[in-house]
Amino acid sequence: MIVYKGSIQPSMVCETPAVYKGNLWKRLSQSKFRSSFSLKANDRSYVSEKGMEKVREHACDFIRKRLAPAEIPNDGKQTPMRGHPVFVAQHATATCCRGCLEKWHHIPKGRELTEAEQEYIVNVIMEWIGREIH
């Protein structure tokens, strides 16, 4: 399994430069729904106990299995609202389903995600989690 590291940077975005031109964090903060998410005490404890690298591994696995395939039968419903810090982060960052990825990150539906896109998504999720715990 590939474990992606580092903070998101424009050079890592590859096919999705509009995210940075549109200022992702500002746009997410202006969404009532997206900005309503935060890590609860149990999520923070989980991150503290497992560590960011283990949480990153989980994020890579979730993205590879739940978002990367070209066709997802339950798209829009595949990411629980709670139960893991990565799930919460996915909703907060609009990386929860292919529809949200298309709308917010300009990553088209109907095709398999590239490794660069998966890395970008994991980096967005991990940056949000990092911002939440610090």
Predicted regions and their residues:
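Core of compact, soluble alpha-helical bundle domains
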Residues: 16-63
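Sequence termini and other peripheral, non-core segments
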Residues: 1-29, 119
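Immediate flanking context of iron-sulfur cluster ligation sites
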Residues: 73-93
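Short Fe-S-cluster ligation motifs
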Residues: 120-134
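Iron-sulfur (Fe-S) cluster-binding segments and ferredoxin-like electron-carrier domains
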Residues: 99-119
